[in-house]
């Protein structure tokens, strides 16, 4: 298991540079290389002849003959499986498991919330390899023989079928898949010639009809949990108001000095210099293509600047990874809503509390006091944020089932849950009606009063003028104005950028 884990770490180091289907192809290619090496390294593996006479597993000395060797092996296997399932269940119901789910659903969003995708992908990859290596060791002792053919594509395909048919991304899925596809071949022996065809048809059925696997059928048929709307919402109880949250990280000045960003021959940002003080609400406006979202991407680490400096709290953040910048107290929302669609509303927010949580593997397994206190505090934070963004009555709904306006509010809830002191909102009022926009403005004012620093990209000029302390205007990648909303409304360069030269002259 240790050797398997070490080898998987090396393979993962190279494979995780790939994305999507290329990652799968890359890992299969590595498996095939190992298979070829095992087939041809005769001195170590005996080649196709394999290694015979592997001694059976013994838990008790030979002098104790009460329990046979086969029974001892079965006891060891069952006990190990039980321990692994218990441990995995605890990990999956902890910040570690939430991070795995987040990276699987929306890697870029997870990164902006302070979760390192590569760290958690590698951890899952190595853990899976260690468990597989342990299973291979038990198999060798039970059968008494090791052959390189066990590494062939046939066995890789069987494991893949078990995973897909059972349900990927769940703990019961692979267990159900392994049981079903361990029993099915025996049941189908009566149709020996058509057995592989029938197994293939079952797999195609799962992919086409129930892509989430056999566990998905259970999830569809089981009684739905009681809807959150049937429970009393604290936000709707008379005399109880949603308590504003405060930044969990220190807040400080954001300084941009001479920032440039070039994409091959295109200059998206040119000599952008900007200072944002703690507790300010700054509106970043400009025509489409002015470079507003590009500037957000640079501040939050989605893009590295071509030149210039970006400092937050007197620390250089330009070029850092998004999760590193989030850990320093900077997060954002997106122009196009970005959530974890399959997770419930409250679980979306719970994922976003990652930086506040106890992320120790040992604590997650033991459920010690530190872990329990951390999870209790997170539950309270989630409840407060649900009240604050007025989504408590929809807390059990998946994010994909929320209305567009609710999804926008949930995005802000995710940003608040990180504990960041600087929040960048990219067109938060897009698609909202006038009443929802007013509610959003009220929320932003309350956040400013609580100590948050907020930069808003917005095209709703009524909202910007009534909400922001300062207005910064970008045009063609340059700042053409930085001042009060009143001065911005009368500035000729701002009018020209929005309305055109002829209208400005008129």
Question: Can you annotate each of these PLM segments?
Answer:
Residues 1, 65, 69, 86, ...:
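Residues at structural and domain junctions
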Residues 1-234:
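Transmembrane alpha-helices and adjacent helix-loop boundaries
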Residues 47, 51-55, 60, 222, ...:
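Intrinsic-disorder/low-complexity coil detector
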Residues 49-52, 202, 215, 231-236, ...:
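Compositionally biased, intrinsically disordered low-complexity regions
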Residues 54-58, 97, 213, 240, ...:
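Intrinsically disordered, low-complexity segments enriched in proline/serine/threonine
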Residues 68, 72, 76, 89, ...:
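Alpha-helix initiation/capping motif
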Residues 217-260, 503-506:
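ABC-family P-loop ATPase nucleotide-binding domain
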Residues 249-255, 260-506:
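Glycine-rich phosphate-binding loops of nucleotide-dependent enzymes
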